[in-house]
Amino acid sequence: MTQVAKKILVTCALPYANGSIHLGHMLEHIQADVWVRYQRMRGHEVNFICADDAHGTPIMLKAQQLGITPEQMIGEMSQEHQTDFAGFNISYDNYHSTHSDENRELSELIYTRLKENGFIKNRTISQLYDPEKGMFLPDRFVKGTCPKCKSADQYGDNCEVCGATYSPTELIEPKSVVSGATPVMRDSEHFFFDLPSFSEMLQAWTRSGALQEQVANKMQEWFESGLQQWDISRDAPYFGFEIPNAPGKYFYVWLDAPIGYMGSFKNLCDKRGDTTSFEEYWKKDSDAELYHFIGKDIVYFHSLFWPAMLEGSHFRKPTNLFVHGYVTVNGAKMSKSRGTFIKASTWLKHFDADSLRYYYTAKLSSRIDDIDLNLEDFVQRVNADIVNKVVNLASRNAGFINKRFDGVLAAELADPQLYKTFTDAAVVIGEAWESREFGKAIREIMALADVANRYVDEQAPWVVAKQEGRDADLQAICSMGINLFRVLMTYLKPVLPTLSERVEAFLNSELNWDAIEQPLLGHKVNTFKALYNRIDMKQVEALVEASKEEVKAAAAPVTGPLADFPIQETITFDDFAKVDLRVALIENAEFVEGSDKLLRLTLDLGGEKRNVFSGIRSAYPDPQALIGRQTVMVANLAPRKMRFGVSEGMVMAAGPGGKDIFLLSPDDGAKPGQQVK
């Protein structure tokens, strides 16, 4: 059963260092950890790394609001993140930060190689500048009066009243969102990565058959829309790395973020005193395998920019991207008001890590499907599978072995053919773990657990124990049950690390994939102790209530949003009543050719279709992720003819702009076409 050992480097997407880890994050880290633990069990050389994504304007501004330095903020956040991941037994070999010497050196190296190879272009662009803060202002850090319809308090890229798009320089009486000052125009030289030069290479990589079908199909849509040059620079002040020989210019966060994978691995190699592995893993002709586990919202960056950057700087490309969907709770988006926006640390105060690891694993597949954490089903499944089927198998047999036979198992198997059925399943279960068909693996294992429990039911050791002269039969039956339990727990070891440690202590033997062919015969086990406790809905209720209380505590008066976006002048009810807000279903979402800001949305109002252009592309780089969501739109705006077509309304969104735009969604039960009052 031993395989040829492979060298594998596995990463998870880097959590942004301005917020806590929640159950949505944990899906990816659990998925990757289960896969990594399986690879290690099969004897492969696996390096599992991650880091905090620690750069960008949001980090800089939040640190200012907190009255601390960005370095202090990201340092505290890193400790919190690492504590959360350790609590869930995520077995990282290294957890680093993009704000590191290794990442700076590698970012500069890759940039220099791209520049030397002709893939960096310089272009002067005009931007608004905040004279008080001394900073250039992104489009959504400027507000003013719309030059088209004269509506006040509109962003610098498009009007949310009439739907017009424009440049920030066209705003009437523009104001800086950061300081309230009147901005001035300044030219600035920016640096662009020539992504279109890599179109053929990327298309060949897409057609290689390695990528998930859904990812390959989405990439094909992007190719058909045409790849654009990518602005990789930002002007000071900016928290990040300064571009070599370009004072006051900084690498955009999405340039150095994926390089953080390399930086974390370099840091690990340096800690080990390993001077060869970094080159072996990252050189262009490396025979090591490189896998990125990511969410579907960042496919654009990882499938286009990242492999192109690596190709242009003579490093190897990823072997594959393993993309997953989002997490919903009880069939809906995680909600702070309902207490279902649950932080990782809050979960661990009410449940153990293995319970969530098992539930997520049972629902995961290799497809990019959303996973629903139904809290009632969670309780039922954990109790039914882990407690009733698996742990109960051990408890039903261990007592007899401990009390009647001093913990010593029988010298022979009671049913060798049944045992072979269990060990033969290693092929199917192993293939399921390998291909990330986790749900299939769990189904196969639980089917075996049912067989094992039926065996015990039929043999009835509690009856045999009362019959004189049948001690050998009793020992054989219970030893068989414990050996079947051992095989099941070996298959489950990648999923349930804490339970596995307890089981290994009881069995007095390590759970090793390649050792299951040899049962434990004449082997002494330790005294059986309770391995896992049942859970109940009272714990769920306490968890939800605790999450609500955390939201209330965090909702104490703050100055940030209200200071940045003061409440506007009072309007009459009659003024408000003129605005017809409706629930709309997003039937389709796509890029707008010729615009780097707009998405074209096809909205269903419950029988009537609308075409709407919305300036939300910066926050939703994968429009496909919006399809099927409900949102709120202004339905009675006069249609406006734009360069790209006619816009028939406006969708509602919150946030300061850039990556921080959040499309509004109605609560559960709302239907397309219903009026929002």
Curated annotation (Swiss-Prot):
Catalytic activities: tRNA(Met) + L-methionine + ATP = L-methionyl-tRNA(Met) + AMP + diphosphate
Keyword Protein biosynthesis: yes
UniProt entry tagged with the keyword Cytoplasm: yes
Record-listed Zn(2+) binding positions: 146, 149, 159, 162
CDD domains membership: Anticodon_Ia_Met (cd07957), MetRS_core (cd00814), tRNA_bind_EcMetRS_like (cd02800)
Cofactor section: Zn(2+)
Predominant location category: cytoplasm
Motif 'KMSKS' region in this chain: 333-337
Residues engaged in binding ATP: 336
UniProt name for this protein: Methionine--tRNA ligase
Lineage: Bacteria, Pseudomonadati, Pseudomonadota, Gammaproteobacteria, Enterobacterales
Gene (name only): metG
